[in-house]
A protein has these predicted regions:
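Primarily a LysM-type cell-wall glycan-binding module
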Residues: 3-4, 37-66
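Second-shell loop/turn segments in exported
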Residues: 12, 47-51, 57-61, 120-123, ...
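Extracellular LysM carbohydrate-binding repeats and other cell-envelope/extracellular binding modules
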Residues: 12-45, 69-101, 224-225
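Loop/turn positions that initiate beta-strands
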Residues: 55, 86-89, 218-219
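Gly/Pro-biased beta-strand-loop elements
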Residues: 93-187
Length: 225
């Protein structure tokens, strides 16, 4: 229960303190604690006990709870996709949302309005990353990169700039349509925390791999100046 207690104390600090240092430390600690809880069978208020039914698959359970197969598997330490009726799983039932600040070059992951973790990101040079409300559409592991001239650069090619994961985003709710934008990894870690990309949101590969496990397609992404 000590992780849960530490988590509660950190949320109290965030709710009560206006001190930037205290808030930053609480956020850092929460990022670590939340990942520890999400990626293990440890209980948390945002998880539900679920008994596997006849005919269930991880994909079906993931759709039912609007989560990802990866998170169910990792959170229950499953060695394979094979599940049997009567197996008990702890399944995350919260709704993730992503908020990207262009000025701050950071990305905040929340669940049901609660802070989960803050990541450093790189955004578009000259303010090229569009602001507005989006949702994640496609999620691709080891993505190929479509160069601006239309040539496809396969994953593993030195010229492919997308890193290890790609999540495309589409505009919703009156945000102007902007094609070709997304959240991806990078091979150039020194560009994180800067406005250096062609407009996409880039993350350290380890960070985008973590986020990729957590957020399903349909997750809202809000980008602010």
């Amino acid at each position: 229960g000590s992780l849960a207690e530490a988590r509660s104390k950190c949320y109290e600090a965030l709710a009560q303190s206006g001190d930037a240092v205290v808030r930053s430390e609480a956020e850092s600690l929460l990022g670590l604690i939340n990942m520890e809880l999400l990626f293990s069978p440890a209980p948390m208020p945002e998880k539900e006990e679920y008994a596997v039914q006849a005919g269930d698959s991880l994909d079906r359970i993931a759709r039912k709870f609007k989560t990802t197969v990866d998170l169910i598997a990792k959170g229950n330490l499953l060695k394979s996709d094979v599940i049997r009726p009567g197996d008990r799983l702890r399944v995350f039932k919260g709704v993730f949302a992503i908020a990207v600040s262009k000025a701050g070059n950071d990305l905040v992951l929340s669940a049901d309005g609660k802070f989960i973790k803050r990541y450093r990101v790189g955004t578009g040079q000259f303010g090229k990353t569009p602001a507005g409300t989006f949702v994640i559409v496609d999620k691709i592991v080891d993505p190929p990169w479509w160069r601006p001239d239309g040539k496809v650069i396969p994953f593993g090619d030195k010229e492919n700039v997308l890193g290890t994961r790609w999540m495309s985003i589409a505009a919703v709710e009156g945000t102007e349509h902007a094609a070709g934008y997304g959240i991806h990894g990078t091979w150039e870690d020194d560009t994180i925390g800067k406005q250096a990309s062609a407009g996409c949101i880039r993350m350290h590969n380890a960070d985008v791999e973590e986020l990729f496990i957590l957020v399903p397609a349909g997750t809202r992404v809000t980008i602010t100046e």
